[in-house]
C-alpha cells in the first residue's frame, strides 16, 4: 500500500522516481480502507530534506499512510520557503484546536542541543505537544533531540554535552531481539550518529519505565522504549540519506569549524571517496516494524485513540 502525499509536495515526485508507492489524496479517497494517520512534527531547518527522509521510510510499508506535516505555531523557519510551509504544513495550534487524532507521530531532532531544554524558544509549546500525545496519539517516535526532549519531559533523563562530537557510523548491539520493533534486526547494527550530546546508560537503567533496545559501547544508548507513554526514543539517525553525514562534514570544513572525518563512513576514511550506505535496510526495518506495531494495536475508530 502507498503513502498519501499532496501531488505538488516535492517528496511526491522524488519518492515516485525511487519506486516508493505514492498516492494522491484524490485516489486515496476512493479506496475503502482506513489509512494509518501519521504526523511529522518537523523541527529541522531543512524541512524538505527531512520530509523526504521520513516519508521514504514509512511509505515503504505494505500499509496505506496518510502523512500529515506539522510545525510549531510561532517559530518561523529561516531555511524553508514560506510558500512551502503555507502549502503543506499546519501549525500545531491548528491541529490541537481541531481535536483530531493520530495513529503515530514522529517528532524530529533540532540543531539546538547546546541549549538547556527550558531555554528553547518553543519549549512551552513543545511540552504541550508531549502532553497532547497522551490523549491524541497512539504511538510517538522522538528522534535525536526530539527523543531527548521527550525523555527529559516525562522522566527527567539528563542530556550531557560531549567533549567531541559523536560523528559517523557506529556499531550498535541489538539488546532485545524479541522486541516487535526489532524484528529482522541483526545482532550487530551500524547506525549514523551526529550529535554533541548524550544520555548515559546508567541513568537510563535507573528509570524502570525505560527499556534500552539498542545501544553502543562507543556512543551509548540508541533506542529506548517507554511503554507507559506509548513512545520510542531514538538518539541516532537511521533516517539519514547516504550523503547526509558528508553534507554535514563538508559544511563544517567550508565554514572552518573543527570537525573530524566521520567514523566508519568513507571507504578507508577517505573523504574524496563516495560513502557507502550500510544502514538503509535496518532503517526500513525499524520504521516498518513501528508502523506494523501501530497497525496491530491502534483502534480502528480513530476517535477512540487515547481512551484508557
UniProtKB/Swiss-Prot annotation:
Which Enzyme Commission number(s) are listed?
2.3.1.31
User: A GO biological process this protein is involved in?
Assistant: L-methionine biosynthetic process from homoserine via O-succinyl-L-homoserine and cystathionine
- Its chief place of residence is cytoplasm
Q: Site annotated as Important for substrate specificity: where?
A: 194
Localisation per UniProt entry: Cytoplasm
State one molecular function term (GO). Answer: homoserine O-succinyltransferase activity
- GO cellular component labels: cytoplasm
Locate the residues binding substrate.
Answer: 165, 194, 251
Tell me what reaction this enzyme catalyses. L-homoserine + acetyl-CoA = O-acetyl-L-homoserine + CoA
- Any idea what this protein is called? Homoserine O-acetyltransferase
Tell me which species this is from. Paracoccus denitrificans (strain Pd 1222)
Q: What is the lineage of its organism?
A: Bacteria, Pseudomonadati, Pseudomonadota, Alphaproteobacteria, Rhodobacterales
Q: Which gene encodes it?
A: metAA
Amino acid at each position: 500500500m502507498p503513502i498519501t502525499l499532496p501531488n505538488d509536495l516535492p517528496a511526491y515526485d522524488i519518492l515516485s522516481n525511487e519506486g516508493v508507492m505514492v498516492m494522491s489524496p484524490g485516489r486515496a479517497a476512493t479506496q475503502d480502507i482506513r489509512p494509518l494517520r501519521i504526523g511529522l512534527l518537523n523541527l529541522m531547518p531543512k524541512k524538505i530534506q527531512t520530509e523526504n527522509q521520513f516519508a521514504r521510510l514509512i511509505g515503504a510499508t505494505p500499509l496505506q499512510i496518510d502523512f500529515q506535516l506539522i510545525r510549531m505555531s510561532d517559530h518561523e523557519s529561516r531555511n524553508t520557503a514560506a510558500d512551502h510551509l503555507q502549502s503543506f504544513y499546519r501549525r500545531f495550534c491548528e491541529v490541537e484546536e481541531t481535536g483530531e487524532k493520530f495513529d503515530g507521530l514522529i517528532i524530529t531532532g533540532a540543531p539546538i542541543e547546546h541549549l538547556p531544554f527550558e531555554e528553547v524558544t518553543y519549549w512551552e509549546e513543545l511540552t504541550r505537544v508531549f502532553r497532547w500525545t497522551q490523549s491524541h496519539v497512539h504511538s510517538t517516535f522522538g528522534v535525536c533531540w526530539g527523543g531527548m526532549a521527550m525523555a527529559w519531559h516525562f522522566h527527567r533523563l539528563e542530556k550531557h554535552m560531549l567533549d567531541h562530537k559523536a560523528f559517523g557510523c557506529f556499531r550498535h548491539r541489538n539488546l532485545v531481539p524479541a522486541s516487535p520493533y526489532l524484528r529482522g534486526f541483526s545482532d550487530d547494527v551500524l547506525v549514523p550518529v551526529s550529535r554533541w550530546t548524550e544520555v548515559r546508560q546508567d541513568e537510563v537503567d535507573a528509570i524502570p519505565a525505560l527499556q534500552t533496545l539498542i545501544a553502543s559501547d562507543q556512543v551509548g544508548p540508541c533506542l529506548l522504549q517507554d511503554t507507559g507513554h506509548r513512545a520510542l526514543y531514538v538518539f541516532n539517525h537511521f533516517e539519514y540519506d547516504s550523503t547526509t553525514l558528508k553534507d554535514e562534514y563538508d559544511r563544517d570544513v567550508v565554514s572552518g569549524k573543527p570537525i573530524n572525518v566521520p567514523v566508519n563512513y568513507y571507504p578507508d576514511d577517505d573523504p574524496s571517496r563516495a560513502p557507502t550506505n550500510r544502514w538503509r535496510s535496518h532503517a526500513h526495518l525499524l520504521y516498518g516494524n513501528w508502523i506494523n506495531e501501530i497497525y496491530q494495536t491502534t483502534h480502528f475508530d480513530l476517535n477512540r485513540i487515547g481512551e484508557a
